[in-house]
Amino acid sequence: MVENHGVPLATVEIDVKNGSFTQTPEYEGLAHMYEHMFFRANSAYPEPNQFWDRASDLGAIFNGSTEEERVNYFMTVPTENVGNAIQLLASAVQHPLFRQDELERERQVVIGEYDEKESSPFFALDQAMKTKLYPGNFSRKNPIGDRRIVATTTPDKMRTIQNKYYVPNNTALIIAGDVNPTTVFSLAEREFGNWNRAADPFIADPIPAIPPLQKSEGVIVEAPVGAVTIEIQWQGPSVGQDPKATYAADVFSDVLNDPQSQFQQRLVDSGLWQAVGVNYYTLNHTGPITISGQTSAEQLRPSLAALYGEIAKFDTPGYFTSDELEAVKAHRAVTSAFDRERASGFAHTLGFWWSVASLEYYMGYVDYMAQQSLGDLRGYARKYIVGKPHIAGVLISSDERQSLKLAPDDLVMAGAR
């Protein structure tokens, strides 16, 4: 529970440790499908649209999202309706009906979302990269899912997900905003107090570890695009196994993304790249490290060679400076403080970190970031990036690929030169 009396609103959020990371190929996309069914009929609101009508009566703004390692559902309401919002979400999480007629309608909605994503060439590149970066485990990194699985899912499969993952000991209730702690704890006890614990799903059925990437590969996706997009990915740290590296990863990315960094000056200010960015996505099951940007077809080979030249120096003393390090630490502390000012956004942030890592990890985040040294950044680069297997992808038009005589091996070979 987070008090914030800035405006007379409150956000009620439910987070579940579910998402694509729990999906075998037979369930690919069903964590997302379940998210859609959450806002449909339940035992307290058994008719179609009753849930939505009740939410409208409360003046609620509500939604959900499915990611790799978290599914969340939230509802922002005027303060006086927070108790009703808790009741509405409690009924949805504990007593869904999974009506066949609603399932059939929501299938089409989800397939429509898939079609929309599929129309983007960047989605095609993203999917191709994930397939190579996580061989044999694509279903666990694909929240949008498999169209065939979504189109043929049944209420029984929804019930299987509910019984396994939608249990109180795998769920967090977060309430943030203009609320009284005593009141909301009493309301939460009233609505959730009789919800019985179940077996820990990750003890009963442990999630297998993502196997290390064994070799570097190139990926080329052809589409009618103007600029050429280049993306290089590595398997990064898992927050549960190497939390220290995740702090170094964020500082590392911040330093390289600073427009004044040597990295940006040599790649972007030189004119080789139109833009280039570095990111680590924190996950408990092998988050990706990504360097991506855009250039022209004429500059593709020199741009890639220059990038690989920078990557080779990431673990070299002197590549990062103390001034760069302290500047990004201060900036991250300020932005983290600002992020906590908006109650609804803070609820989402807390839910993500509870699901992926822990609240203790999040509450110590700024302090641990501040402790990172130049040696920590070099150690992170040495352990996860420099000389490590990677996937290099390019999104390019067919004509430009043909003109360049570009082959997938060219993308990796550039890094070996």
Task: Locate the predicted segments by residue.
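An aromatic/glycine/proline-enriched structural segment found at the starts
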Residues: 135, 143, 168, 172-239, ...
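Scaffold signal of the M16-like zinc-metallopeptidase fold and its non-catalytic homologs
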Residues: 85, 92, 117-167, 188, ...
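Buried hydrophobic packing residues in well-ordered domains
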Residues: 14, 32-33, 55, 73, ...
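M16/MPP (pitrilysin/insulinase) zinc-metallopeptidase core fold and M16-derived inactive scaffolds
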Residues: 6, 11-76, 142-143, 257-273, ...
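Short acidic/His-enriched helical or mixed secondary-structure segments at domain edges of catalytic enzymes
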Residues: 56, 109-128, 208-227, 262, ...
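M16/insulysin-pitrilysin zinc metalloprotease superfamily fold
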Residues: 40-44, 76-107, 259, 280-339, ...
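A structural supersecondary motif
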Residues: 231-235, 256-295
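C-terminal regions of mature proteins
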Residues: 172-174, 292-294, 323-417
